[in-house]
């Protein structure tokens, strides 16, 4: 362990052109780490609070840096993150901002790894690390909060579950992305791209399912291994209190109809992953869907759990879902994220590590996914801020970090 001697904070751009927080952590023995905070578009009601970048930086300089510089060792992540909590003084990081907190937390972890001369995933891994690598979930067709005039379902995700290596999986997802482009072109369907690089055509959800199914089948035949797909439904964005149901272009589905609809799609397309299929406050509906299809697919809580151990425990008690999405900025520190993963693992839930729609070239989540033996990592298929993580996964597998 080595004492933190300086922390530098600045504004940088994220992938949407918005300001975010970058942190540098330096130690007395020459260790260095840099972390950048991502930002979400489809955010859960219970997420940690992100402040405007300038405000988050000013608050962190005033409250957090004096508790860290000359006081805490970079190699002790739990102490670093406890100091961030103490500096903030709230339960949602509304004091210094989750964006400043997570940037500092990630930078300190990297500085600690740098001092040890170890890859970040080894520094974070502890007893988690198994022999497998996460399968990347590639966002191929997008709508919802990520793209206007597109599908109601927010993400259609390629899942190369049969890939023999991370490298093959990454290139398979890129090929599915290109194949969907070609299918759209053949159908004279123009499509721009959403926040995460997914195609955003003006098609119905049913046509998007059909296109994805055709694309993954074609690419699976070309690559010679199984490729499935999954969904991020973003159910909280579809649910409307006044309508008392899930609002689609073709009408409103009741909770019972939404459960039946998603369960039917799992059966029809053999989906391997379904994220936030229902509203973020409806543990009972999540439990009902999990009882129906939980032995066939991962029913993953993102807005439902927000990387929060208390909300996860409530879900475990209710048998709601069978997996949790892990987003460090959603809870504010790496320690909080790892605590959620530990609880999930102990309770038989899988943990899926994820990017945000507003991303940076930071690669911390690639290391976190490897360190914690995650079955999947959500980090897009194309775009520099996405491929930064994917290429890092390839390097990790090749022992080149």
UniProtKB/Swiss-Prot annotation:
Active site positions: 196 (proton donor), 327 (proton acceptor)
SMART domains: Enolase_C, Enolase_N
GO cellular component: cell surface; extracellular region; phosphopyruvate hydratase complex
Required cofactor names: Mg(2+)
Domain of life per record: Archaea
Positions bound to Mg(2+): 232, 275, 302
Pathway involvement of the protein, from the record: Carbohydrate degradation; glycolysis; pyruvate from D-glyceraldehyde 3-phosphate: step 4/5
Locations listed in the record: Cytoplasm; Secreted; Cell surface
Reactions listed under catalytic activity: (2R)-2-phosphoglycerate = phosphoenolpyruvate + H2O
Main location: cytoplasm
Keywords: Cytoplasm, Glycolysis, Lyase, Magnesium, Metal-binding, Secreted
Claim: Metal-binding is one of the keywords in the record: yes
GO biological process: glycolytic process
InterPro entries registered for this protein in UniProt: Enolase, Enolase-like_C_sf, Enolase-like_N, Enolase_C, Enolase_CS, Enolase_N
Residues annotated as binding (2R)-2-phosphoglycerate: 154, 327, 356-357, 378
Enzyme Commission number(s) of this protein: 4.2.1.11
GO molecular function ontology, one term from the record: phosphopyruvate hydratase activity
NCBIfam families: eno (TIGR01060)
PANTHER family for this protein: ENOLASE (PTHR11902:SF1)
Family the entry assigns: Belongs to the enolase family.
Role description: Catalyzes the reversible conversion of 2-phosphoglycerate (2-PG) into phosphoenolpyruvate (PEP). It is essential for the degradation of carbohydrates via glycolysis.
Protein name per Swiss-Prot or TrEMBL: Enolase
Source organism of the structure: Haloarcula marismortui (strain ATCC 43049 / DSM 3752 / JCM 8966 / VKM B-1809) (Halobacterium marismortui)
């Amino acid at each position: 362990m080595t004492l933190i001697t300086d922390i530098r904070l600045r504004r940088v751009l994220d992938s949407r052109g918005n300001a975010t927080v970058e942190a540098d952590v330096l130690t007395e023995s020459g260790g260095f780490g840099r972390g950048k905070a991502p930002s979400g578009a489809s955010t859960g009601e219970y997420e940690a609070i992100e402040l405007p970048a300038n405000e988050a930086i000013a608050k962190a300089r005033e409250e957090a840096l004096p508790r860290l510089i000359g006081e805490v060792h970079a190699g002790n992540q739990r102490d670093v993150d406890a100091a961030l909590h103490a500096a903030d003084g709230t339960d949602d990081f509304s004091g210094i901002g989750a964006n400043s907190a997570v940037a500092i937390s990630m930078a300190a972890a990297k500085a600690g790894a740098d001092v040890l001369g170890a890859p970040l995933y080894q520094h974070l891994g502890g007893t988690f690390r198994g022999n497998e690598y996460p399968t990347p979930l590639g966002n191929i067709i997008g709508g919802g909060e990520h793209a206007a005039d597109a599908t109601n379902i927010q993400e259609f995700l390629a899942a190369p579950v049969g890939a023999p290596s991370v490298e093959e999986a990454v290139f398979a997802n890129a090929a599915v992305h290109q194949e969907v482009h070609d299918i759209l072109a053949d159908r004279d369907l123009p499509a721009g791209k959403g926040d995460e690089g997914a195609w955003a055509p003006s098609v119905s959800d049913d046509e998007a399912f059909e296109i994805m199914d055709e694309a993954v089948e074609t690419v699976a035949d070309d690559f010679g291994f199984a490729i499935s797909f999954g969904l991020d439904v973003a159910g909280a964005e579809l649910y409307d209190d006044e309508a008392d149901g899930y609002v689609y272009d073709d009408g409103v589905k009741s909770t019972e109809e939404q459960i039946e609809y998603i369960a039917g799609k799992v059966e029809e397309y053999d989906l391997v992953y379904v994220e936030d299929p229902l509203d973020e406050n409806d543990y009972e509906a999540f439990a009902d869907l999990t009882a129906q299809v939980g032995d066939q697919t991962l029913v993953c809580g993102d807005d439902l759990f927000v990387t929060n151990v208390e909300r996860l425990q409530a879900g475990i008690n209710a048998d709601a879902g069978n997996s949790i999405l892990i987003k460090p900025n959603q809870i504010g520190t790496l320690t909080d994220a790892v605590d959620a993963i530990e609880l999930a693992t102990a309770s038989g839930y899988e943990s899926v590590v994820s990017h945000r729609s507003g991303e940076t070239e930071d690669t911390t989540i690639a290391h976190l996914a490897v360190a914690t033996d995650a079955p999947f990592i959500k980090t897009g298929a194309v775009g520099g801020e996405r491929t930064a993580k994917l290429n890092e996964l390839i390097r990790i597998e090749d022992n080149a970090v």
